[in-house]
Structure formats: C-alpha cells, structure tokens
Design a protein with these regions (language model features):
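A donor-sugar binding/catalytic signature common to diverse glycosyltransferases
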Residues: 94-142
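Mid-to-C-terminal functional-domain signal that highlights helix-capping/loop sites
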Residues: 36-50
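Structural motif
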Residues: 25-26, 65, 107-108
C-alpha cells in the first residue's frame, strides 16, 4: 500500500518527507520554545504564536501553505496549535525533517525572533519577523506589526521580490560587527566569547553606563 504524503495529526496534516513539499509554495514557521525571552518579551502580543499562524492563513494566497514545525523540546500537545481551528492551509512538519532544509526550500520564513529567520536571510529568502531582534532591519526582512503590514509584506514578496545579494548579506553582517560588543548575558555562550568573566563584566557594565549617560538617566536620578 502506498504511503500517504500527509497523515492526520492533532487536527492538522503532517508531512513526513521534505520532497512531499517540492511542488508547494509555503511559509515556514518553526514554533518557539516557551516560556523564553525570545517570545516574551521580545514577541509582544505574538507570544501567542497562534496569532501569527492565523494571520498568515488569512493573508496568504489560496495556493500557499503554512508549514509549522514544533520545537523539539516542546513535547506533547502544542499550546499554539491547540488554540487553532483545523485548516487545510496548515501543515505540520515531522521533526525528522531538518529545519534548515525547510528554510532553504521555503518561499518565505515567518518567526517571532527565531534563528530560522536569520538563516532565511543568509539564504536569500524573504522573512516575516513578528518580534524585535537584531536582524529585523536586514534586507528583505519584513517587520510585521499587524495584519495590514503582513499583507503589504506578502504582496511585496509575490509582486516584486528580488533576492538579497551576497554583497548585501556581507554588508549587514559587517554592520552588526561594527555595532556589537564581545560579551555574553547567558552562560551557555560563555565558551564562544573567548574573554574572562571579569572582562565580560567590565564590557556589560560599560555598555549599561553608556546607555544611562546617553539618556541622562544618571543625572535625572540625582
């Protein structure tokens, strides 16, 4: 018996192999692990991830899908999906499919602040970002605040999209390098920075004081 491309799963269809999406136009939306600062506070209202999915359903053309992938650490029934009514435009990607492969094949990426959005930018894809994060001003990254801005972004992608050039990608990364500092605020990234705890503390405190001075917060409190 031929294996079905899509199997019913929690009121949504599931795709188990990437090639089953070969002829599909889709927006890839990997769900965030929650609770985490990547969606609260950085996502604002879109901490409720079902709002993102629902807006995409309502604004995408009829022949486009929303391919959703659960976070590998979420487990069980996902809260965002449990709040949605069943819809044929929403497809769940099996966890065996690599996220980066879904990014590379997607027509666009949607995320609150996720790594998939940055990967989409690096792979010259249009990105719909619903939160606030460092790459939100990158070329072909569309900041979404409401249904109107999402509709405008979708129309821009469909009507007049020009993939980001390698030169534009490099220019943005160089700008990030010029405007960031080597430090960490999460111990998971300590080993990647190559600086001591004392250097890290000095850098972070210096950056905080710089902001306070810029906004005259220190003088205001005297």
């Amino acid at each position: 018996m031929r294996k079905k491309y899509f199997a019913d799963n929690q009121n949504f269809k599931t795709v188990e192999l990437l090639e089953h999406l070969d002829d599909k136009k889709y927006v890839y939306l990997p769900l965030h692990f929650q609770p985490e600062c990547s969606s609260c506070p950085l996502g604002g209202d879109y901490v409720h991830q079902d709002l993102m999915i629902d807006m995409l359903i309502k604004n995408l053309p009829e022949d486009w899908l929303v391919v959703v992938k659960k976070h590998v650490k979420a487990g069980g029934k996902d809260y965002a999906l449990s709040r949605l009514r069943p819809n044929d435009k929403v497809i769940l990607a099996d966890n065996s499919i690599k996220s980066l492969d879904l990014v590379k094949q997607a027509s666009a990426i949607a995320t609150i602040t996720g790594t998939a959005g940055f990967e989409g930018f690096l792979n010259h894809k249009p990105v719909f970002i619903f939160g606030s994060y460092f790459y939100m001003d990158a070329p072909n990254v569309f900041k979404v605040s409401d249904s109107r801005s999402l509709k405008h972004a979708i129309n821009s992608v469909i009507d007049d999209f020009k993939p980001t050039t390698l030169q534009e990608v490099k220019a943005f990364l160089y700008a990030c390098q010029l405007n960031t500092s080597r430090a960490w605020v999460d111990n998971r990234y300590r080993s990647h920075c190559g600086i001591s705890d004392a250097e890290n503390a000095d850098t972070l405190s210096g950056l905080i004081l710089e902001k306070f001075n810029k906004w005259n917060l220190l003088d205001a409190g005297r």
